[in-house]
Amino acid sequence: MTTDTARRHTGAERANEMTYEQLARELLLVGPAPTNEDLKLRYLDVLIDNGLNPPGPPKRILIVGAGIAGLVAGDLLTRAGHDVTILEANANRVGGRIKTFHAKKGEPSPFADPAQYAEAGAMRLPSFHPLTLALIDKLGLKRRLFFNVDIDPQTGNQDAPVPPVFYKSFKDGKTWTNGAPSPEFKEPDKRNHTWIRTNREQVRRAQYATDPSSINEGFHLTGCETRLTVSDMVNQALEPVRDYYSVKQDDGTRVNKPFKEWLAGWADVVRDFDGYSMGRFLREYAEFSDEAVEAIGTIENMTSRLHLAFFHSFLGRSDIDPRATYWEIEGGSRMLPETLAKDLRDQIVMGQRMVRLEYYDPGRDGHHGELTGPGGPAVAIQTVPEGEPYAATQTWTGDLAIVTIPFSSLRFVKVTPPFSYKKRRAVIETHYDQATKVLLEFSRRWWEFTEADWKRELDAIAPGLYDYYQQWGEDDAEAALALPQSVRNLPTGLLGAHPSVDESRIGEEQVEYYRNSELRGGVRPATNAYGGGSTTDNPNRFMYYPSHPVPGTQGGVVLAAYSWSDDAARWDSFDDAERYGYALENLQSVHGRRIEVFYTGAGQTQSWLRDPYACGEAAVYTPHQMTAFHLDVVRPEGPVYFAGEHVSLKHAWIEGAVETAVRAAIAVNEAPVGDTGVTAAAGRRGAAAATEPMREEALTS
């Protein structure tokens, strides 16, 4: 190797090492050396305590997207005195991928009981996401426990004030909290009554934890693998990775290494594992058998994401942890964006989709566009009304912009001048995953029932109906004879047969599917679960039961099918109406056919890939993408800044969107007044104040 070649190799290695360290800082929210500021503490101060520092002259700021990132940034900047306009493509609601199905004034209720609601998107908030939780508290919203694992309702004390948000910094152990402790608050005990059903074997989670052999043998596992739960397998495989940055104590808990080693350890994790998919890690690094990988993928919900980056599943393993505490917002997750939006009525413009973005960056070859340039606006955004892609455009101008829409959606926006090469690559290549939910409403919370509850409710429909559902192995003719005479001629059969159901609401399509379905359903024990979820290898994959009843109601909405990636793609092939019959049938395979009597015929479904504004559930990198371009995702392009979950390394979480929104707001607030036409807003609020919006045909870049 020549001296020049060696130098080039050394230079490339140094550049790579700097990339790994910077990515570790992004992940951990560590500021630049030498101060190594804890950015989370700073963001908490800005978001919750003191707001942005007083700015210089107010700036005209355009924000694209009224999801949680756009709303948080808009709120901070408006309170700081800037002239903010938030452009939202959706004409009907704010919130982006925070969406709750609920009754709206003047519109048909999504469920038979208008009091019911259910989440189409974000549904749980972990205790280690302090920005989101503290914001919820600051806005006066009520948070309550979300039960990732079902609980014993006779234990704990949830009626006491909820504990405050608490964060302990990696710097000098400094702490932040937003209230006094609440020692009276107690979480209920976990029961693990919910189900795992795979390969026609079904056990409760509690049984699987003590004896996983029957489930594991269904995947053809042998030897010691049959005696380990898949969760234990994965944890054992990940222990060497955790050793990079933390130390295991005698009691099994882990503590972070001293700061420099902790940061360097995470940089080494990025270096050594960003090139792995989760499937490759389990097979090559952990040396699991193919059968073990299949079991892990099915039960731990990794199957459809085994081809995606190791890092996403590794971080998600910490984020969706059965031992962690999770919260939800009473009234639905929608309460968070809607509450923020109330104070931004004058700033939000609904039903305006960005189709063209032009900006002036004096650092780029003196380029100026048709609408931007020296002495004029630095940013011009052109929009069309929702549902009118070929309409004449409306132009909005400003000094700076924050783009919060997903890159999957930004891909369809004309940008002049083009972003830098690495940014364009990130916009083009960032992998967006799929997620699809199917929700079904029932007039009684049968998942909480004991067998005594089942007998009471079924025999209230017709004496002997409980015994009918308990019969097993009969052919259809025998089953028909066993059916009580009083319910043989119901117009919908036993679908929605309970008196609490208005069977006239059950659509003919669903009734026809029900009549022609060969599934009679097995006999299954009462689930008797409060919250939590079950797992199956049928297309529904994951099922979640409500953590809390809606006050004054006896029914509830079950998340009957929750799937990601390729699993979600199968559901996306069906029309919405078709999904309900399949979801009910697959729910019955786990819980027994008798649940049909409480089905109201009402359901809702959400495919985020088919959503025209989201174009996918969330950014989920493939191997190498994080090291290839994530640092370029974060960087602004002249006067254009970026925020959203995809700009963070907390992909798919509200916390990632919030932290990037605060960061973008700080940067825009502190941006110097340069040769970009920054002017004080005059007259009315809104970034179009200094330049009246004009109508014109869409320009090409």
From Swiss-Prot:
Cofactor(s) annotated in UniProt: FAD
Record PTM text: The precursor form is proteolytically cleaved by an endopeptidase into alpha, beta and gamma chains, which form the stable mature enzyme. Activation by proteolysis occurs after secretion.
Subunit note: The LGOX precursor forms homodimers. The mature enzyme is a heterohexamer composed of 2 alpha chains, 2 beta chains and 2 gamma chains (alpha2beta2gamma2).
Organism: Streptomyces sp
Major location category of this protein: secreted
UniProt comment concerning the protein's domains: Contains a deeply buried active site and two entrances from the surface of the protein into the active site.
Catalytic activity: L-glutamate + O2 + H2O = H2O2 + 2-oxoglutarate + NH4(+)
Annotated site residues (Important for substrate specificity) in this chain: R305
Subcellular location, record wording: Secreted
CC terms in the record's Gene Ontology section: extracellular region
Pfam family, one: Amino_oxidase
GO BP, sorted A to Z: amino acid catabolic process
Protein name: L-glutamate oxidase precursor
Role description: Catalyzes the oxidative deamination of L-glutamate to 2-ketoglutarate along with the production of ammonia and hydrogen peroxide. Shows strict substrate specificity for L-glutamate, and exhibits only very weak activity with L-aspartate.
Result of altering W564A: Strong decrease in L-glutamate oxidation. Has little influence on substrate specificity
Coiled-coil intervals, chain numbering: none
Impact noted for substituting R305L: Strong decrease in L-glutamate oxidation. Changes substrate specificity, the mutant can use L-histidine, L-phenylalanine, L-leucine and L-asparagine
GO molecular function: L-amino-acid oxidase activity; nucleotide binding
Binding positions (FAD): A69, E88, A89, R97, M123, R124, M354, S409, E645, W653, I654
Temperature dependence: Optimum temperature is 35 degrees Celsius at pH 7.4 and 50 degrees Celsius at pH 6.0 for recombinant LGOX expressed in E.coli.
Class of the enzyme per the UniProt entry, highest EC level: oxidoreductase
